[in-house]
From Swiss-Prot:
Enzyme class: transferase
Disulfide bonds: none
Annotated Pfam families: Aminotran_1_2
Catalytic activity: L-histidinol phosphate + 2-oxoglutarate = 3-(imidazol-4-yl)-2-oxopropyl phosphate + L-glutamate
Organism: Chlorobium luteolum (strain DSM 273 / BCRC 81028 / 2530) (Pelodictyon luteolum)
NCBIfam families tied to this protein: hisC
Encoding gene, per UniProt annotation: hisC
SUPFAM superfamilies xrefs: PLP-dependent transferases
Residues annotated with N6-(pyridoxal phosphate)lysine modification: K218
Pathway recorded for this protein: Amino-acid biosynthesis; L-histidine biosynthesis; L-histidine from 5-phospho-alpha-D-ribose 1-diphosphate: step 7/9
Protein family (similarity comment): Belongs to the class-II pyridoxal-phosphate-dependent aminotransferase family. Histidinol-phosphate aminotransferase subfamily.
The protein's name in its UniProt record: Histidinol-phosphate aminotransferase
């Protein structure tokens, strides 16, 4: 009898699919993955590689990347015992979810949010409590808290500023949710450098159940290096890191991080450029017929059009990649485009104008 391999696999695999970037990852104007348009300057790459070639390549790195942890802790002004470094923030999502979830445990996820949250929760066979955003794509903090208490959830994950909506929760709302729900609250601040709201990082000093997640892939322009961090009270961090994969961060990532943090003015300049372009782009999009732009606290903008598939395909035909997010709840007709260089942004505006004629 032929063996059915599916009966040996996690049944949750039947509910999820492989991660796919629609349209691919290569285009003359690539605005679909919320990356920085600025690469690390060559002089800094050369300084990084000069140090890296002196490292032993035949030896494992430290079990945990202590040099990277200490550098980022010093940058934030927090004790190193509160910080963990991962191979991208996605690795830390898996780690934290494994520490908090399992069959019968409950996670609250505002909807829409980063798709990986639901995927990992399903793999962990957890029960998902979905809380919709408001019609304007803003968070409904009152409803989040109401459902968290009613469902006695174990973990709340808040992407703020949110991907894909671009909207934020205030630190006061996060404090209220964490205090009154009693659940562990994971605050994913992947886009915090672009936000009009301050970081929720000070809440780690105040509350025992708040975890902050950071990525170096957006503002720091290190998507290719895979560097992420979590910050939490030391007692909580000691538990969250138990499932962590050892040796997951390589020596090059640690060295790169230290050099970029030591030259942080480069990051500030690029963020300033992106924020200026974001405001200029939003203003121009507001004046265009046939679309509705949404205000954003991130390095991307959401626009709503009548036929997102047709507009997506038209732009792709012009060599411009954006993200079709119209399949997300409450985001019917929406496309997501990250802020690029000025010339790239101009090509996007011109392409949209032609697509909407």
């Amino acid at each position: 009898m032929q063996n059915d391999i599916h009966r040996h696999l996690n049944p949750a695999l039947q509910k999820i699919g492989a991660y796919v970037v629609e349209g691919g990852q290569e285009a003359p104007v690539k605005l679909n993955q919320n990356e920085s348009p600025f690469d690390v300057p060559m002089w800094l790459k050369e300084a990084i590689t000069r140090e890296f070639v002196r490292e032993p390549w035949n030896r494992y790195p430290d079990i945990l990347p202590y040099r990277g942890i200490e550098a980022y802790a010093e940058f934030l002004g927090v004790p190193a015992g509160r910080v963990i470094m991962g191979n991208g923030s996605n690795e830390l999502l898996y780690t934290i979810f494994m520490a908090c979830l399992g069959p019968g445990r409950r996670i609250l996820i505002p909807e829409p949010s980063f798709s990986l949250y639901e995927k990992i929760a399903l793999l962990m066979q957890a029960d998902i409590v979905s809380v919709p955003m408001r019609r304007g794509l803003d968070f409904d903090a009152d409803l989040i808290l109401e459902r968290a208490k009613a469902e006695a959830v174990d973990l709340i994950v808040l992407s703020t500023p949110n991907n894909p909506t671009g909207k934020s929760l205030s630190p006061d709302d996060i404090r209220r949710i964490a205090t009154e729900s009693g659940a562990i609250v994971l605050v994913d601040e992947a886009y915090i450098e672009f936000s009009r709201h301050p970081s929720a990082l000070p809440l780690v000093d105040e509350l025992p159940n708040v975890v902050i997640l950071r990525t170096m892939s957006k503002a720091l322009a290190l998507a290719g290096m895979r560097i992420g961090f979590a910050i939490a009270p030391e007692a909580l961090m000691a538990e969250l890191t138990k499932p962590k994969i050892p040796f997951a961060s390589n020596r090059l990532a640690e060295i790169t991080l230290r050099h970029v943090l030591a030259n942080y003015s480069i990051v500030k300049d690029s963020v300033s450029y992106i924020l200026d372009e974001r405001e200029r782009m939003y203003s121009e999009l507001e004046g265009m017929d046939g679309l509705q732009p949404f205000m954003s606290d991130t390095n991307f903008l959401i626009i709503r059009v009548a036929d997102p598939r047709a507009v997506f395909q038209h732009l792709r035909g012009e060599g411009i990649l954006v993200r079709n997010v119209s399949g997300y709840p409450l985001m019917e007709g929406c496309l997501r485009c990250n802020i690029g260089l000025r010339d790239e942004n101009r090509r996007l505006l011109d392409g949209l104008s032609r697509a909407l004629r």
